[in-house]
Amino acid sequence: MDINSIINPKHTSPEAIKAWRDKFDNAVPYRHIVIENFFNEDVADKLYNNFPQIDTLNVKRKSLNENKSEDYHFDRWDPIFSEVREVIKSEEWCNIMTQLTGIDGLKTTMDALGSGVHQGQNGSYVDVHVDVNMNPQANLWRRINLLVYLNKNWQPEYGGDLEVWDKGMKKMYNKVSPTFNRALIFYTDDNSPHGYNKINVPEGESRKSFYTYFYTELGKDFKYRDSKFISRPDDSKARKLATTTKETLKIKGKQFLKALGIRSLDFQDKNK
């Protein structure tokens, strides 16, 4: 399938890619870009009109630090989702992602850590965090996140902006509103904290996005890092303590399980 049948052609020309690369490299506090009208209009409309109902998404992430649903079983959804995934995982698009980011050998996978959808109802949030940097089943190094928001008529008072923080959590450098057909591409490592505050949306509304994570081979510089939630400066002392305690216990617990040879605790297929 021609990538320009899915991705807006104005973003795939050599001139456009060079311009995005310049913006990506010069973004602070870490490399990221925001692209408007990412998909062709008809594609974005089809994704929006056929977005799966939240009660059909079988992975529910609800804890002190997050409240959202997700899924990646494309065979259960309208064919447009599979068509989009096929283009985004294509060699042609992965080569564009390499040109755009400067990271050689980017590719994605067909599992939960490849592509899928996120959705949150009223009250949904994901506290600021850094991502796990490995797909353990594919044995690949996670390098780039691509999020495309699919929320028509999103209002500022709904909240849900994706916050871009510096590593030390001293300053929030950017807020990306999850408006319709807006893409966010960013480098993911321990220097890239991000998350969104609790949303306040009317009944029937939700915060929706299509995600793809891009990888490279592990390489000699790879060092495993788990996902980790990080307190905001204005969090209460009690919440900061609770987050720190929970994350410390989680990481130590996973280290223990890893020593026992259990590597995929967080990556099991919860949809079967």
What are these regions (language model features)?
Residues 134-142, 152-272:
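Catalytic core of Fe(II)/2-oxoglutarate
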Residues 40, 44, 77, 81, ...:
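A structural signal for well-ordered alpha-helical scaffolds and beta->alpha junctions
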Residues 145-147:
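Eukaryotic charged/polar low-complexity linker/IDR segments
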Residues 34, 58, 107-110, 116, ...:
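A structural signal for short, well-ordered beta-strand segments and their strand-loop junctions
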Residues 12-15, 21-101:
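Non-heme Fe(II)/2-oxoglutarate
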Residues 32, 129, 194:
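Histidine-centered active-site/metal-ligand motif
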Residues 49-52, 76, 85-142, 151, ...:
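Non-heme Fe(II) oxygenase catalytic core, chiefly the N-lobe of the double-stranded beta-helix
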